[in-house]
Design a protein with these regions (language model features):
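Symmetry-related core transmembrane helices of the 12-TM Major Facilitator Superfamily/SLC fold
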Residues: 188-207, 401-418
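Juxtamembrane intracellular "pre-TM" segments in multi-pass secondary transporters
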Residues: 3-26, 210-256
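Cytoplasmic membrane-interface "Motif A"-like loop-to-helix N-cap segments
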Residues: 88-101, 308-320
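Helix-loop boundary and gating motifs at the non-cytosolic
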Residues: 18-73, 249-288
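Helix-to-loop junctions at the C-terminal end of transmembrane segments
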Residues: 78-91, 181, 298-311, 394
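Cytoplasmic helix-loop-helix junction between adjacent transmembrane helices
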Residues: 127-168, 358
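C-terminal transmembrane helical hairpin of 12-TM major facilitator-type secondary transporters
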Residues: 310-355
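C-terminal ends and interior cores of transmembrane alpha-helices
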Residues: 101-118, 321-332
Length: 426
């Protein structure tokens, strides 16, 4: 077979896809958006009832906090490994398929855990962690593929359309779970039905693969053949020396956001409380989560707009939002708990979007990749610590949980204020 790098591209072929079947960039962007929509239905649908599911299998609050916190940490920290791996190997599609397959398989498999007797809880914990590892495996490679498609239509518009479809799945998944759980009167059928959007995500991804060139191939093919071999560009590697050269203001900001992450109780622990204390019917738990995801989307848009106009000061709201959550979400009043969950969603929206914008402002362009890797590692460590702490304190004393998170957020607020002051003085 002729190697792509040994031939020059022509009008009929780009990379490894003939022009006659190749999709336009916009169709590829929308295609990736549909994949994310379907996959988010699977993951977010499961996330909306992780707490009640683990509780039904005999988990304590501290175990729920540990597993949900560790899952979020894995999804963040392991990207430091799989991002460079995708660039070094060029296997963007392989890693993307592998990550989505883990989600499509592990989440519906949770439906069998209630029938595994004493092993059910352990198997459920492993499946939850494996699904989150899948997120880390696919995210860097998928984002590179999306950027390859979106480059022709504008990265801003392309990523915005993709994010809108992604958020639609984050709302639709919990709504589907709520409907099935209400009809069935139990949780496992709601997990089982998620095999449908999971399979759809893989089928659409396979379809896109047939219609879109592989970046690793098309970039090699589009490069003119030189008479002498060009020196191979160095592969990205994780270097602690680069990390240690990041400015002090970045480390202050990472510490502030780490404290905010540690205090942001996972929805697993919140939903555990909502069902254990019968604050709301179990079928309402995913509905409340869907509303929180809508709040997250609105908060991300609003905080992003305010950030562009007023700078990082908008992020001072994050520790305040986080501190308010446990005081409301862990009450036995349904209206107060729902308000607490909506505030939790707003905090998630700010944390997952606008926080990352300030990172880019605090470090030189040449060290942004390193900075985002370090930032993800700090947030991951904080997620494990915070999830475990919240679960342990919930089992012992709710007032202690509320007071501890308030103290952590006061620390985050001070660190954030110092960060903004130093950034202003630079």
């Amino acid at each position: 077979m002729t190697q792509p790098s040994e031939t020059l591209p022509n009008a009929a072929t780009v990379g490894d896809v003939p022009a006659s079947v190749r999709w336009s960039p916009w169709r590829a962007v929308v295609g990736f958006g549909v994949v994310s929509l379907a996959a988010d239905m699977v993951y977010e649908g499961a996330r909306s009832i992780t707490g009640p599911l683990l509780a039904s299998l005999g988990a304590s609050a501290v175990l729920v906090g540990l597993i949900t916190g560790a899952g979020e940490a894995m999804a963040l920290v392991l990207r430091v490994v799989f991002g460079p791996l995708a660039d070094r190997s060029g296997r963007y599609w392989t890693l993307t398929f592998a990550g989505y397959t883990l989600t499509a398989v592990c989440v519906p498999a949770l439906a069998i855990t209630p029938f595994l007797a004493g092993a059910g809880l352990a198997v459920a914990c492993l499946l939850i962690l494996a699904e989150r590892a899948g997120k880390a495996v696919r995210s860097p490679a998928k984002t590179a593929l999306l950027a390859h498609a979106a480059g022709a239509v504008g990265l801003g518009r392309g990523f915005a359309v993709h994010k809108a479809l992604d958020q639609a799945g984050a709302v639709a998944g919990p709504l589907l779970v709520a409907g099935v759980a209400a009809l069935a009167g139990t949780l496992w059928p709601a997990m089982a039905v998620l095999i449908v959007p999971g399979a759809a995500a893989l089928l659409v991804l396979a379809w896109i693969r047939r219609k879109m060139p592989d970046p690793a191939v098309s970039e090699n093919a589009s490069a003119p053949r030189a008479s002498t071999p060009a020196r191979e560009a160095p592969h990205p590697r994780w270097r602690w020396r680069s990390a240690s050269s990041l400015p002090t203001v970045f480390w202050l900001f990472a510490a502030a956001c780490g404290a905010a992450t540690a205090g942001l109780v996972t929805y697993g622990v919140i939903s555990y409380h909502l069902t254990r204390d019968q604050v709301v019917p179990i079928a309402a738990v995913p509905l409340i989560y869907a509303a929180a995801m809508a709040a997250a989307a609105l908060a991300a848009l609003l905080s992003g707009w305010l950030f562009d106009r007023h700078g990082g000061r908008v992020l001072l709201s994050l520790p305040i939002l986080v501190a308010v959550v446990p005081a409301l979400a862990f009450t036995n009043s349904a209206p107060a708990a729902i308000v607490g969950v909506l505030i939790w969603g707003a905090a998630v929206g700010v944390q997952d979007s606008t926080v990352k914008a300030l990172v880019a402002d605090l470090v030189p362009t040449t060290t942004r990749a390193t900075a985002y890797g370090v930032f993800a590692a700090v947030q991951g460590a904080a997620a494990i610590a915070g999830g475990t702490l919240a679960g342990a304190l919930y089992d012992r004393s709710l007032p202690a949980l509320i007071a501890t998170i308030a103290a952590i957020q006061l620390t985050a607020l001070v660190l954030l204020a110092v960060t903004l002051h130093r950034d202003h003085d630079r």
